[in-house]
Amino acid sequence: RPARSHAKSARSVAETMGNYHPHGDASIYDTLVRMAQPWSLRYPLVDGQGNFGSPGNVPPAAMRYCVTGDALVRLPFGQSMRIADVVPGARPNSDNAVELKVLDRHGNPVAADRLFHSGDHQTYMVRTAEGYEVTGTANHPLLCLVDVGGVPTLLWKLIEEIHPDDYVALQRTPPMELGPADWHDTMEALLLGAFISEGCVSETRAGFANLDRDYFTMVARAYDAVVGDKRDVYQQTIASGSLQHTLYTQNVTALKQSRLWQILGMRSADTYVPEWMWHSPAAVKRVFLQALFEGDGSCSRRPHNTIQISYNTVSKQLAMDVQQMLLEFGVISRRYLHAAGEYKVVITDRAQAELFPKQIGFGGAKQTELSKILAAMPPCAGRDSDHVPGLARFIRRHCDSRWVDKEWLHKHNIDHLSRWRRDGAEILSHIADPDVRTIATDLTDGRFYYARVASVTDTGVQPVYSLRVDTDDHAFLTNGFVSHNTEARLTPLAMEMLREIDEETVDFIPNYDGRVQEPTVLPSRFPNLLANGSGGIAVGMATNIPPHN
């Protein structure tokens, strides 16, 4: 309303899409922008605040939304960075021009041309059942899987509208890689992973120990190549009877010249992945994770033909970082606090356990052990937690198939991704309706993991940031969540189009899903069509109504 403060455009678009137009936000936002432009309408219906474009075809800003500075933005080739580090030292309530390539909702590189530091605002953290987290303002939109009249649909929901047991979409397309990584960076990544898991670095000495001689030799050679300082190597038999290989040095002068020095004096409970590793390409991160898992990781065969790959640490931040980096490679894991006081990152789904060695793997003998476990297990049974909620019910209800095909669809598991990867063509052959086939194919192509929301919690007032992305939906990835930026309110003339609408002046009918009512026409005391004109495509013809004085 004109007498009230401006509202976030994201909120208006989300409410319109949720109540009246479940077909994407782009057309809604484009309409809102046009109604705020005095060069597009003789009498604008929206009072916009912010960048709504210009007569010279300067595009409008995206709908403003905000996440906290620690959110990791995905970049091409497996790189990522904190959104607060895009423009170091950006002032609160500032717009900063940038030239940055980020990944969109499909995992494709797109241009981001501006960083917004939106000041300090109240924030909320969305946490999934697996442990994935993102923190943002109440009006920050995330891509969610929503049941729209029985149809599972990808829609934007504001954080304030997200509740436990909702489903958010996590982007998990493996990164595109361009050639081998820099040799020196790779060796530093190997050392970092090895020393975080099984080493120590202090002001006066550094050391690393491992039972696998071949892996130990690889780490020692990497140390010589990167650090190049004098070090000692010795072996000793430990209590278990195994032979432990140890690298030790009391001269850390050369070590201080490498990026390994960043973990100096770090307590085990305070360990984390340094920022330079997040900025590294996928090939470097892979070597880091291989060393990390070879040290404190494990794999084991479990009852009922199941498997578990896990990483244990006493550092909550390191567990979060490991889970996030696994997601960057498309591997879904679960993070939790074990009764013993350790944080565990575990991979238990068969498909994810098979993906782990393909995308990452262990750095030494544990990789051979994992290969043996997988080879000894029967073929994947096709059922795990990786599924599309509501898809099976939707297909069975709307497939429009013969009774024999309907019976087949009711008997078989048709909402789990493992089944679609293996038998997708067979499932589609039993679905007659082409629209149902299209929806099912789109939701099961593997781009997204549909994670159940466990909680939405108050995280207090924090500095928040946003990016302007040059695409139709303005989407980019933050901690794997798909994030979707302006403020607006109605003008007095627009209120004349709505006056007395709640006094039975027009007829109302149910909306598309029957949850709310929508008017068949607006009262419109202000003759908008005559004053502002309109243009569009009718049935097979173009129509234009010019504005009149």
From Swiss-Prot:
Q: Its catalytic activity?
A: ATP-dependent breakage, passage and rejoining of double-stranded DNA
Limits of the DOD-type homing endonuclease domain: 191-331
One of the GO biological process terms: DNA topological change
The UniProt keyword set, sorted, is: ATP-binding, Autocatalytic cleavage, Cytoplasm, DNA-binding, Isomerase, Nucleotide-binding, Protein splicing, Topoisomerase
What Enzyme Commission number(s) does the record list for this chain? Answer: 5.6.2.2
- Domain Topo IIA-type catalytic residues, every copy: 1-549
- Any remaining note in the record? Few gyrases are as efficient as E.coli at forming negative supercoils. Not all organisms have 2 type II topoisomerases; in organisms with a single type II topoisomerase this enzyme also has to decatenate newly replicated chromosomes.
What is the annotated quaternary arrangement, including any partners? Heterotetramer, composed of two GyrA and two GyrB chains. In the heterotetramer, GyrA contains the active site tyrosine that forms a transient covalent intermediate with DNA, while GyrB binds cofactors and catalyzes ATP hydrolysis.
Please identify the protein, giving its name as recorded: DNA gyrase subunit A
The organism encoding this protein is Mycobacterium kansasii
Q: What is the lineage of its organism?
A: Bacteria, Bacillati, Actinomycetota, Actinomycetes, Mycobacteriales
Q: Which gene encodes it?
A: gyrA
